[in-house]
Amino acid sequence: MRVVHRRRGDVIAKKATIIAVTNQKGGTGKTTTCENLGIGLAMEGKKVLLVDADPQGSLTISMGWQQPDELPTTLSTLMAKAMNDQPIQPGEGVLHHAEGVDLIPANIELAGLEVSLVNCMNREKMLKQVLEGAKYDYDFILLDCTPSLGMLTVNALAAADTTLIPVQAQYLSAKGLEQLLQTVQKVRRQINPKLKIEGILLTMTDNRTNYGQQIDNLIRGAYGSKIKVFDQTIPRSVRAAETSAAGKSIFAYDPKGKVAEAYKSLAKEAQADADRQRKLSSERAR
């Protein structure tokens, strides 16, 4: 993870690390990972903003706002302001969750906004403009991307420092990685040259079976020499699948379960990466 600093007089201000949690395939545990990694980082004492960048509003619903269409301000509202050069007030549209993270919610209006982005000048960078005012208020900003490679996902990749890719431990999910990696490379070349791949996270794993071990070995063998594959994997669990309906994170719903422990370890692994990058960035800023 990359942490950038800027000087304000004699004070160095830290900018949030922005992570796009993305996979164009649905059902990979993307929303679950965004929510629980964010709350795991908050449990480590970090200030975290989650951004629901999916018109389905899955992250919004999963975090307990069961009627996203009734929310007065969502990501669509803020991106429309950016498109029309209207000011966005500090904290506008931000919801506060009981588990210590903030959320910019989404609903179906975001689908209509994605269509209008096509005719917008600087269309790939509207989300980046929305986040401009928040990036010095948080340690981490996590973007839950839509399961497609459309304009909203491109906006997320254009705004991000890194992308984290959850991949379900199945053969077809592993095969779909190549298309996403090509999109990341294209965004890096044309829009955001600083974009890095945070890593591939294996989700819904079951290494008790030969098949599960084969998929793990397949992905690590195919990509591990070029891209980080997180040591920590997220095991399959019925309890984890129940959290969305409960409107709670895995830490609140099943705090002693294996999935909670896995996300806790993932947060520590991610934080260790951030600490290393922070040290390097501080040395370069001197």
Per-segment meaning from a language model:
Residues 1-286:
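P-loop NTP-binding core
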